[in-house]
Amino acid sequence: MVVEFVEALLFVVSRLFVFLFILSYFSKKNVQRYVFLAYLCTKFCSMKRVYQVAGHRFAVVMPDNHLAWNEMKPYEPFLAENDGDLIFTAEMVDVMPDTSDKQKITVNCDGADMPRIELYECQGQWLLEIAPLLEAPVRVYLITDKAFHTAKFRVLGSMRFSLGTVLMLMFAFATAKKNTLLMHSSVTVKDGKAYLFLGKSGTGKSTHSQLWINTIEGCELLNDDNPVLRVMDDGSVRVFGSPWSGKTPCYHNSDYPVGAIVDLHQAKVNKIRRLSLLEAYVSMYVSFSGYRFIKEMADGLHATNEKIVGTVPCYSLDCLPNADAAYLCYNTVTQ
């Protein structure tokens, strides 16, 4: 309620300011003043909202009447009442800075039907050009300082895809040195503990979560695509819900201690085994977001991964998409 009241108050004040400004200058035919007025309208009518995910706060700045806010419904459970310490601020702009001298660093794409992300270095900053598919044209431009603290982005395509991608990437990059991993995983909760299911796209992570929910009493879904793992100050490992949950609308602002992490593999026979520390490290390594060639980011991801696999039991599950696989996994990882 406090956030809504403040936003409403700022909206009224900004509109009043613009109205008075127009009354004062309407009769004066001065082009420069009208240009300045348009600039003020844009600045004063912008809206800033703060969100908190896994204990990390970030801000989004967009025009207050922009349709893009309609795509922020998944973020509403994560609204924060004040700024606090922000890990990043992302602002939507109509015009990007000049990037003509950009130098390509790398291109990431996990398949023809997956987003393509091109990373450039440009005037001491990072520039990301993002397309929704491998062969699709660029639809999002994102430029950020090297610390991933201040970002500007321009959207040319789908607002839902663009906003989700920009904020998810910024969150992953900005938290890489903060004992935090943005995972590619489905998470099911049972008896106050959370169980993460890892695996390549199409392996059956969501299916396995649903098998637990449908066959084992008292299970519920926390997140179906991008939960957040965090090593807490006391050394414990907790998993948090996030606004990013893939095709399943599951946006829970809650967190649980991690009971186990399970790497899934499709097979003709159900079989499970405990992973060694090295195996667990590798299994986790391919399941979280971040650029490994940026040394500071890689060091942070490595340190967090080490802490997690040294604390949380990790397993490999060869499985069929059936109830027997769910029971085998549940009975093993909850012992």
Per-segment meaning from a language model:
Residues 208:
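Hydrophobic positions on the alpha1 helix immediately C-terminal to the Walker A/P-loop
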Residues 204:
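Conserved glycine(s) of the Walker
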Residues 2-26, 35-40:
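Hydrophobic alpha-helical signal peptides and transmembrane signal-/tail-anchor segments
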Residues 46-196, 201, 211-220, 228-335:
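A noncatalytic interaction/capping subdomain that flanks phosphate/NTP-handling catalytic cores
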